[in-house]
Amino acid sequence: MSHKIKIYDTCIGCTQCVRACPTDVLEMIPWQGCKAKQIASAPRTEDCVGCKRCESACPTDFLSVRVYLGSETTRSMGLAY
């Protein structure tokens, strides 16, 4: 089942979410916006099973990676920007 995955620019490039994902949905791509010069990307969202292990692994104060299940959206989660 596919789920919407959003990577926020608070990503510090630590790779914790990539290593936590049991279905290899996430990968790191080059990005100049952080010290690590890489950011998480979700090119294979169709493989996401919604376990949210990536969220649990994220060490930032505000989760840099979010998985929205079914009808959840940033608005329904109270995270609208």
UniProtKB/Swiss-Prot annotation:
Which cofactors does the annotated protein need, by name? [4Fe-4S] cluster
Note the superkingdom of the native organism: Eukaryota
Query: Keyword Iron, does the record have it?
Result: yes
Entry-linked InterPro entries = 4Fe4S_Fe-S-bd, 4Fe4S_Fe_S_CS, PSI_iron-sulfur_center, PSI_PsaC
Keyword annotations from UniProtKB, A to Z: 4Fe-4S, Chloroplast, Electron transport, Iron, Iron-sulfur, Membrane, Metal-binding, Oxidoreductase, Photosynthesis, Photosystem I, Plastid, Repeat, Thylakoid, Transport
Gene3D superfamilies recorded for this chain?
A: 3.30.70.20
Per the record, its GO cellular-component terms are: chloroplast thylakoid membrane; photosystem I
Which GO biological-process labels does this protein carry?
Answer: photosynthetic electron transport in photosystem I
Domain called 4Fe-4S ferredoxin-type: residue spans? 2-31, 39-68
Compartment list? Plastid, Chloroplast thylakoid membrane
Query: What is the protein named?
Result: Photosystem I iron-sulfur center
Write down the species: Chara vulgaris
The gene designation is psaC
